[in-house]
From Swiss-Prot:
Its main location: cytoplasm. This is Peptidase T. Belongs to the peptidase M20B family. It catalyses: Release of the N-terminal residue from a tripeptide. It is an enzyme of class 3 (hydrolase). Its cofactor is Zn(2+). Binds 2 Zn(2+) ions per subunit. Disulfide bonds: none annotated. Cleaves the N-terminal amino acid of tripeptides. The gene is pepT. Pfam families: M20_dimer, Peptidase_M20.
Amino acid sequence: MRQALLERFLRYIKIDTQSDGKNLESPSTPSQFEFAKLLKLELEELGFHRVELSDKGYLSASVPKTIEGVPCIGFIAHLDTAPDFSGANVTPQLINDYDGSEIKLGEDEVLSPELFPHMLKYLGKTLITTDGTSLLGGDDKAGISEIITALHYLLEHPEIPHGEIRLCFTPDEEIGRGADHFDVPEFGAQWAYTIDGGQLGELEFENFNAATAVITAKGNNCHPGTAYGVMVNAQTMAARFHAKMPLHDTPEGSKDYDGFFHLINMQGQTEEAELTYIIRDFDLELFEKRKTWLTERVKSYNADLVLGSLEIEITDSYFNMKEQILPYPHIIDIAEKAITNQGVTPLIKPIRGGTDGSRLSYMGLPCPNIFTGGHNFHGKHEYICLESMEKAVDVIIDICKLTAEEQQA
């Protein structure tokens, strides 16, 4: 399976499928739909059943059950890559028998174990890197490659007992819309796993509670030559507001179970300016306190203004899936055992972000997240270990086996 997995992955990452948060259509970019069409043809040629591509860009398929009485489970990955960094003209480098040295990425960049010490875990392994001009696309084309490789193996080995297995590849996960048009009843699984994690062994069923806050500064524009006592510069108002945000309460100042405020966009002119923050916290009570605190800060800021004003609008994005998964401990137990069976120590940790699984869990499909084998997603230093990808394939296969064994026990 190693060569098929590698060839599949290298083929997929050459297709630029960045999503576009400014486009409200689904998928947000035509390239995602074209990629889904190619995958549909591949799944049909490989013998998958019920291969269907929706008009919103969701591709689903099935592996038929080989025994009765076993729950239908699913595996999910996403078609898009992050809009944060170029996904075009991906030129991967294969580093066989990695020796622990820094890896040159094109002419000007390096991938160094001094900056990324986790590279030293992969001595003697095969690494796949970028050439420094793009992201790699392992998030989540590694997940797609691993799911197809694993489930094709099960198709070719009907002697292995398992229930019906569903897969779905979703668009626009990177812009938070991957679950928008996901049809949970049609998918038909009792639970699922997103294959969208990072390093070898990761198993995640906690994620941030998430919201977006848009703060609009309302100023007053006029000719600068006659501005005295009249002009109110909305950009200055916005800048002063942000300057008084807590310095430690940011992504770069937080880790583990810490939450944060993150200014992701600042734009405007004299008349009107806009600050966009994302709000994150694992604890629901602290999450609500963060939203209240920011709202009160706006009110307090307005109270000190003579001219101009700030307005705030907060929209919830997703919630911590832990609350929806803990009532079904067997979902985690099976995945943990499958990882352990491969000689890998499960790395159970919170996701400092979100996945399709977080929203799907609240839509009635409990859906923890499993590793792909990659590191440094969304940038030019992204890399993935081929042997870790192989382990992910083995974990997927073993989850299907263990689900059947548990039901028969």
